[in-house]
Amino acid sequence: ADTGVDCLGYLPSMEGIKLPPKHSVISVANRHSLNEQADLIAEQLEKTVDINRLLSRCNRNFPCPYTLPYTSDMEDDSPVLPIRKIKIAVARDPAFNFTYRENLARLAKWGNITYFSPLYGYELPEADLIYLPGGYPELFARQLHRRHKMMEALKKYAERGGKILAEGGGMVFLGRSLKSKENGTAYSMSNILPIDFIVPAMPKLQSGYRKTVGEDMELKGYEFRYTTIQQDDTLITNRRSMITNLKGSEELMPFYRYKNVLASHIHWYWGDKDLIKLWE
């Protein structure tokens, strides 16, 4: 009451609730456990949180009219419109699924979205722009390594000047190789960026809010990764952009650019940015 902020409820400590680490929630066993715990937490929230008041304070209208899969009929209030509709291919499967809903809505405004799976698919869709979002490719390194046809098509697309935007795990898939453990097998990836990635024996989480300053726009995003660069044989970085944390201190990580391929460790939030300018 002293702060002038209404308390809409609380979640008490619950016996038996133990959420798995973020890095392991993608496994089948942990997903099953997580779903069961989510149901228990939901039941508790109904008892201790004023749900109706909470929803009344939200900016969005509920129930939300959009459900997965998101398609190109999503509306966006942004005034920036493309000159023409473009074909956009978005990777989406258990290895690549870290996307912001607003980013998908933004892409849907720019063009017609086709989803594809680097993990299970063989064909790369015809596209003017390919978006490889983040994920945990290190958990599927062997399976991805076997998708030779997919990786060859992706490399040919990049070499002939195709536009690719890769974030986090998406950038790892563009690399030369990936070791899911320090003394393990180096599985070959798409070899678009001459970079070797590895998950160290003692994985250290690199995380935090980031922004890039330079070019004609400022982008903000979040870094969350366990992989590190074991070897980087490239100078194909976009030196005009500097990545900093929110305090303004420079982060020692590059924003890679090779031909029309843009890649970084950051999961960017695009907002109403004119993304096409990234390739101008």
Question: Model segments located where?
Answer:
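Short, glycine-/Ser/Thr-/acidic-enriched flexible segments
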Residues: 93-96, 120-121, 136-138, 171-172, ...
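Internal gly/pro-rich beta-alpha loop/helix module
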Residues: 1-76
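Short acidic, glycine/serine/threonine-rich loops at helix termini
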Residues: 19-26, 101-103, 142, 176-177, ...
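Cysteine-nucleophile active-site neighborhood
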Residues: 136-212
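C-terminal and late-domain segments of enzyme folds
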Residues: 47-48, 82-83, 96-106, 112-114, ...
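Short, solvent-exposed amphipathic alpha-helical segments in soluble enzyme
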Residues: 1-2, 103-109, 146, 182, ...
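Phosphate-binding active sites in nucleotide-utilizing proteins
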Residues: 79-148, 152-159
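Structural motif
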Residues: 131-133, 165, 263-265
